[in-house]
Structures are given as structure tokens and as C-alpha cells.
């Protein structure tokens, strides 16, 4: 019997234990008594397990945040940029004294 046909049939002969009869959706469904007694300023004292994890991603993008640009790198950290500023010329001097072959990018 194909898998799809088995999934579509009702599972009447299957035995459920007390653990498997618990539904995660029942936790997410608000109780009517809770809604009547709560004020708009009060927040619920508990958050159901997994409530915030449904369909939520922590970050927008993953792994594509660094997009290197040679032009920007040389403009920011290049020799001419170092030579123009007072602090940059100190960096060039320090690297030259240390014996670096490459003073900047």
C-alpha cells in the first residue's frame, strides 16, 4: 500500500497513550476564562514551550553578511589613505621600522 494512501486512511486501530494524546495546539489555544479575567496591561505569567519558535528566525540573513570590495578596502586601508592622515603615517612608520614588506594593502 503506498505511503500517501496509508496517511489518508483513519488510524482507528492505533492505540494512544496519555502522552501522545496531549496536543501542542491545545497549549497555544487561549482559555476563555483566562481572557475574561486578564486586563490589557497584564501579560501571561508563562509562555508555552515552543510558542516563539514556530516560524520564527532569529536573524534575517545567515552567512552572506561579508561582501568584500577591493575598491573600498584599498580606499580605507590603502597606502594613500594611510599617508594622508596623521595616524596613518604613524602606522606606515611603525610597519617600516618593523621590517614589513607590505606597508598597507
Swiss-Prot record:
Q: Which residues form a coiled coil?
A: none
Record's superkingdom? Eukaryota
Q: Where in the cell is it found?
A: Mitochondrion
Q: Which GO terms describe its molecular function?
A: structural constituent of ribosome
Signal sequence segment: none
The transit peptide spans 1-16
Q: Which GO terms describe its biological process?
A: mitochondrial translation
Q: What is its main location?
A: mitochondrion
Instruction: Detail the disulphide connectivity of this chain as listed in its UniProt entry.
Output: none
Family label: Belongs to the bacterial ribosomal protein bL34 family.
The job of this chain, per UniProt, is described as: Component of the mitochondrial ribosome (mitoribosome), a dedicated translation machinery responsible for the synthesis of mitochondrial genome-encoded proteins, including at least some of the essential transmembrane subunits of the mitochondrial respiratory chain. The mitoribosomes are attached to the mitochondrial inner membrane and translation products are cotranslationally integrated into the membrane.
The family database entries (HAMAP family) matched by this protein are listed as:
Ribosomal_bL34
Query: What quaternary arrangement does the UniProt entry report?
Result: Component of the mitochondrial large ribosomal subunit (mt-LSU). Mature yeast 74S mitochondrial ribosomes consist of a small (37S) and a large (54S) subunit. The 37S small subunit contains a 15S ribosomal RNA (15S mt-rRNA) and 34 different proteins. The 54S large subunit contains a 21S rRNA (21S mt-rRNA) and 46 different proteins.
* Further remark: Present with 200 molecules/cell in log phase SD medium.
Descriptive protein name: Large ribosomal subunit protein bL34m
Amino acid at each position: 500500500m503506498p505511503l500517501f494512501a496509508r496517511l489518508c486512511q483513519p488510524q482507528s486501530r492505533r492505540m494512544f497513550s496519555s502522552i501522545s494524546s496531549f496536543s501542542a495546539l491545545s497549549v497555544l489555544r487561549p482559555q476563555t476564562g483566562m481572557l475574561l479575567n486578564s486586563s490589557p496591561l497584564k501579560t501571561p505569567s508563562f509562555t508555552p514551550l515552543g510558542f516563539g519558535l514556530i516560524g520564527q528566525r532569529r536573524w534575517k540573513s545567515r552567512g552572506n553578511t561579508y561582501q568584500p570590495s577591493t575598491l573600498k578596502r584599498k580606499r580605507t586601508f590603502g597606502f594613500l589613505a594611510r599617508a594622508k592622515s596623521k595616524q596613518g603615517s604613524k602606522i606606515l612608520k611603525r610597519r617600516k621600522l618593523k621590517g614589513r614588506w607590505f606597508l598597507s594593502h
